[in-house]
Amino acid sequence: FNEGKYPYAFPNFGAARMGAPMNAFVRVDSDPVRLRSQIYEPDYIIIVDPTLMRGYNCFSGLKEDGVAIINGKEDMELPKLKAKQKVFVVPANEIAMRTIGRPLGNTALIGAFAAATGELKLDNLIEVVKKRFSGKAQEGNIQAVKEGFEFVSEAQTYGAKRT
């Protein structure tokens, strides 16, 4: 991590086909992460595919003051949450189509996560994108990170679609 922290990430999926629903977990700490179990009470959740919210409680265990970021549209139906929980619905796939030409909203979602939580700095995210991509892919992904960040920043400032 560029911010002096230790991340540990791992997926959890069954013996299913490519594209099937799955969970991924990330632990971040100021010390090396030794715990290797699933996360049952997350501080934050990011829902990349909102169709997973049908028939599955994606918000199960989200902490009292937790934050959820959902790749979706403003008019989507949201579950009832606890008073201090926040949900940001970000049109990440639309941002990605406009910036990189493909509906892969991951970089827009990580920008949104940075703005919603303060856990990551935008400048550091941009540096990571610069190291990971080159050419037009780099330019598009930098723009996607910025737009995801700005979308949530504006929602926090102006009370736009924030539930």
Regions found by a protein language model. Give the residues of each.
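Active-site cofactor/cluster-binding pocket
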Residues: F1-T163
